[in-house]
Amino acid sequence: MLSPTFVLWDVGYPLYTYGSICIIALIIWQVKKSCQKLSLVPNRSCCRCHRRVQQKSGDRTSRARRTSQEEAEKLWKLLFLMKSQGWLPQEGSVRRILCADPCCQICNVMALEIKQLLAGENNQISLTSLGPSQGSSCLEALSTSSVSFKHSQDLGSPKSKELSLASVTPTLSQLMDQKSLTQSAARSAGADSVQDSWADHFQRGQRSQVPAVSQVMGSLSSNFEKPGIPLSQQERTKNNSKFVLENQEAPEVGLDNKMKLFLHWINPEMKDRRHEESILLSKAETVTQDRTKNIEKSPTVTKDHVWGATTQKTTEDPEAQPPSTEEEGLIFCDAPSA
């Protein structure tokens, strides 16, 4: 009853199913692996790119250094050959080739550098140190040197060329000496002007201090010499005068300290003058202290005296003097403050 077809079907069906499941799993695994490889490839490529860029930058710097060194060596070799053969160019023609404007600082500096190279000097001239006056003087020096070169070429002797090159160098030294002299003169003039201004400021401050002290002393004496002033008003005037003196002395002390340091730094001869001024100020302070002590010792008007004076006035002439409520209120307000 069993045919071979049915047997194969019964055995092959599960094999087909399990085999298909395994094949699907293998396909999924391969897909995941390929995705992981694709994700890792960009990182490796980026690292390789960075390495290549770094190597290229290092190679470029090394090549630039080598080329600069080679160019410098070639330039010195050319200069040596030109000097040995007497093939030196004219400086005037070099300046004309660079620029037609005689006031161009860049071209003037380049012409000076060429002149130094031709003369065999290694000093470098900065662009900021050259002004319009120096540019004109440099142009004059170049013109004189060009004339000397033309004359030497007419003669046709290399020794005369060397002498003309040597004659150009003193002109540069003279220009630098003139510049240093002008700078030193400007610095000395600036120091003198600063010293004069500080001296004027010091004299003005001294003049302003003397009348201020005299005004304060006069106000103190006038306030304390007035008879019949209540005790509270006298104390208020004392407090006000002390506050004014403290406010005047605090900034004056700070200014005095700053002036001492600065003047002693500029001119040590001002130290003795400042010592005399400090002695005068100390004497003025002692005088003010003595006067305040004498005023405190002097008898003062009390509450009873004021009350008695007011009652006497009211009893002597009650009809002529109407009742003043405002004055009495002021007296009562001032009395407890004393």
From Swiss-Prot:
Nucleotide-binding in keyword set: no
Protein family membership: Belongs to the SPATA31 family.
UniProt entry keywords in alphabetical sequence: Membrane, Phosphoprotein, Transmembrane, Transmembrane helix
Protein name, entry field: Protein SPATA31F3
Subcellular location: Membrane
Ranges of Basic and acidic residues composition bias in the record: 290-306
Primary residence: membrane
Transmembrane segments: 7-29
Annotated source species: Homo sapiens
UniProt xrefs under InterPro entries: SPATA31F3-like (IPR027970)
